[in-house]
């Protein structure tokens, strides 16, 4: 079983909507949006549309006027790519969400913010290899394509024994340099190269494998597979969902503050201001509990191993 970026976005959205209890109004495009500067949009129905925000794909658009006879919308001159979203084209029959409670753009941002925050507690396990040269003690951390790798710490290192035994012998003396000299290794102050220095005896020409901890990666494309892009096990997916959910719920009450609009006052008579906060705290508690469980599991799988740095 795999989970993609799109799957996680949909799971966050359906949780926030109470499965099917709350549904945003929607319609469809009756003609493709073929340009990122188009200011006239044709839809199948304008019965639920008014002046304000619509969402097509991940783009937010500000609608200035609408024609209920011709089912067309007129976008404000500044209305494409509204609120920092990216203006994009859209195919005919694409979904048009009217005043989305949680825009996909914001949901995706919350997911990646959660992944970055998790880096303080949990790490992705990665590995790289290099061929040992007895004349060289220091090696740059590079992936198979020659790009720099970024490590938090070294978990373990082994080298492949000579002969048919297929044994990988632990490297006892190895040191990580997270900010290698720019003059020697290149890179920059913002993105320095990282190196490992080996002080053990290793048979020349043998492969050395370094297992290291790294920050979880973020997601970008809808088709990105969670485990591949982040480096985390699939069991961490629900942590990301819970983290994104509590982040999004945090900002519901400020939108209903009494100084915002008369409509907010009317809503407050039915649902007290601050009611969202208690729900958010419950979800945050679940998030921290699951994160602690996953941290413990990771520590059991990769216990601290003693190695010398010199």
Predicted feature locations:
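Glycine-enriched, solvent-exposed interface loops adjoining structured elements
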Residues: 1-33, 47-82, 86-310
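Short alpha-helix capping/helix-loop boundary micro-motifs
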Residues: 38-44, 83
